[in-house]
Regions:
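Intrinsically disordered, low-complexity segments enriched in small/polar residues
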Residues: 3-5, 68, 125
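Internal alpha/beta scaffold segment
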Residues: 1-60, 64
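Mature, solvent-exposed C-terminal subdomains and processed small-chain segments of exported/organellar
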Residues: 64-74
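Dual-mode signal for accessory low-complexity, basic/Gly-rich regions
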Residues: 23, 77-250
Length: 250
């Protein structure tokens, strides 16, 4: 037996997907997972589908949040101004975007929000600070009490099909299970399911595996960001192709 899901979110009700389309997508995603196989333990490139990619970027934001930093509970402590991604990576906040899922003119402290870079040319350009956490760190607030608003990860590649071709052989991830991310150390280990890919083509579904790595390594080994952006949340990113993650299976 297999299961999957799909959903639709929009600020404007007229932009919601039709119920029949949501149901059909959920059914199609479930059916294609039938016959899932285990993999032998290996180290291969991993493509995080767009709906999962936002979680990886969310781990970044947890690592640069003021609360974790002043408690010295972050793997990115003292990394401001340092290279943590390849030079082409750009991650920025657009809090005043009309119709954006996370738009807001003011943060939780009442400070006016503004456009800013968090990652520019691969370098950590800003922490994520409220008035309180900024004071604890001896730094000004970045007007991010309550978190980031409308975070964008710029694409440097095509859609998911193009990224599969670029990957060649590896794992396409479509589900992550559990909460095995340690923000203090950056260690990353989660149950997963998806599809085995060879020569850029999906071969068969896989299940009952674990993917593992370290967020610092994952960030630096980012190979591509797709243009297949999942626009349903506060973090807007396409699929993420990351080189050399460990897959634990049989």
């Amino acid at each position: 037996m297999q299961r999957d899901y799909w959903y639709t979110v929009a600020r404007d009700g007229n932009l919601l997907d039709r119920m029949v389309d949501v149901g059909r997508t959920a059914a199609e995603r479930t059916i294609r997972r039938l016959g899932g196989q285990k993999l032998k333990t290996c180290k291969v490139p991993v493509l995080f589908s767009a709906e999962l990619a936002g979680g990886v970027i969310g781990n970044l934001m947890a690592g640069i949040s003021g609360g974790n930093l002043y408690r010295q509970s972050s793997f990115l402590l003292d990394h401001l101004g340092k290279q943590i991604f390849p030079e082409w990576v750009h991650i920025h906040e657009q809090p005043l975007l009309k119709g954006g899922m996370g738009s807001g003119a003011f943060d939780g402290d009442g400070l006016q929000t503004y456009v800013k870079d968090f990652i520019k040319d691969g370098v950590l350009a800003n922490y994520l600070l409220s008035t309180y956490s900024g004071r604890k760190l001896g730094m000004p607030s970045t007007a991010n009490a309550g978190g980031a608003r409308n975070l964008f990860v710029d694409s440097n590649a095509g859609d998911q099909k193009a990224l599969l071709k670029q990957m060649g052989t590896g794992l396409l991830l479509t589900e992550l299970i559990g909460h095995g991310v340690n923000i203090v150390t950056g260690d990353y280990s989660r149950g997963a399911a998806g599809f085995w890919v060879e020569n850029g083509e999906i071969q068969y579904p896989v299940s009952e595996i674990t993917i593992a790595g370290n967020l610092k390594d994952m960030f630096m080994q980012l190979q591509a960001v797709g243009n297949d952006v999942d626009r349903r949340g506060n973090i807007q990113t396409g699929s993420l192709l990351i080189d050399g993650m460990t897959i634990a299976g049989n």
